[in-house]
Amino acid sequence: GIRDCLLSRGLGDVYKRQLQGRGVLVSNEYVAARAEILKSNLERMGVSNAVVLNETPARIAEALPEFFDRVLVDAPCSGEGMFRKEPVAQQQHCEALVKQCAELGAQILDCAAAALAPGGQLVYSTCTFAPEEDEGQVAAFLQRHPEFALADVLGNVDYTFGSAGEENRTGGLSLDVSKVRRIWPCQGGEGHFMARLVKAGTPRTLPPEGEYTPEEQLWLAAAAQAGKKSKGKAAKPAKTADARSTRRADSRACRDAVQGTSRRTRDTGAGEATPAQSLAAWQEFARQYFPALAQRPAVVHGGGVLLSVAFPQTGLHVLRAGVFVGSVQKGRFVPEHHLFTAFGSLCTNCCLLYTSDAAD
């Protein structure tokens, strides 16, 4: 799994390509409003194996000790690299802010270290020039955590970017600054800093694609059991319709889902069907339009159906775990935008969706 303290669109797309549908990408944002934006970004990118949390780093570390194989800490910082783009950042800047951000970054790094599995890798990044948050931060972390070693950010790649760190910015602590990187504004960046740290131990390996470890199978079963206990309204009986009108309705619903223009209640609202009815409706829809997904583990959450990911039930505040594929409305299954961004290439019988309605 990968835990990301703050995920931007670009970072999410990179991890989506690297994971290739395997493992789980856990993305956390402490601010509730930004967490909702994060969830929407992952949906638009079609990430199918993501979990979005709205939690504190300390609670994550406590609930998931040594759980993650990769951790990216895009730390909250004083934002000195944003002075050129955001004048308000310069107006708000002060020494107290730098100190506060350095202390907060240290706390987050300690939590990330506890959540990282043996042999895992931790990447720390900021967009500030302040040495207390950059070279000094990494040097102090290594003193607190001797189980970590500094690795070259560039690794084995055949290209370079930015420049090495600076020895006079370590606060008098020992650090091989040649292994960290800065990207100054004159180098096409915005004052970015990054370092890569490796935890002692043997790295774990992911199971083959489409397979789950025994532990992951237990997590999926627990999620399914929790979904069966969720409350939902009784399903309204569907009106009798011929095959043509049914396909026309499917076409319109799928068109709205593909375009992301649906005004329907999201997965945070109550559904119209019981969990069992919702799952049955999804499976019927999937057999016709997404047969490759019909047997994927699915759960019901907030009245909607999600293709779940293998993630333990920890009591953490989870905004999204998996792909929200749709919900039952007015007695029929209505697909969601996320279904098409994540699995649109798997859709079959498309001619039934796009040719059944002359208006399409």
Feature locations, PLM:
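S-adenosyl-L-methionine
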Residues: 36-63
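Mobile active-site "lid"/loop adjacent to the S-adenosyl-L-methionine
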Residues: 32-33, 70-110, 123, 128-135
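Helix-to-beta-strand junctions that scaffold the AdoMet/dcAdoMet cofactor pocket
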Residues: 20, 116-117
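Conserved SAM-binding motif I beta-strand of class I
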Residues: 24-29
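A short acidic, Gly/Pro-enriched loop at the edge of an enzyme's catalytic core
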Residues: 62-70
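Polybasic, low-complexity RNA-engagement segments
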Residues: 190, 200-356, 360
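Conserved Class I S-adenosyl-L-methionine
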Residues: 135-156
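Single conserved hydrophobic/aromatic residue that forms the stacking wall/gate
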Residues: 1-11, 15, 354-358
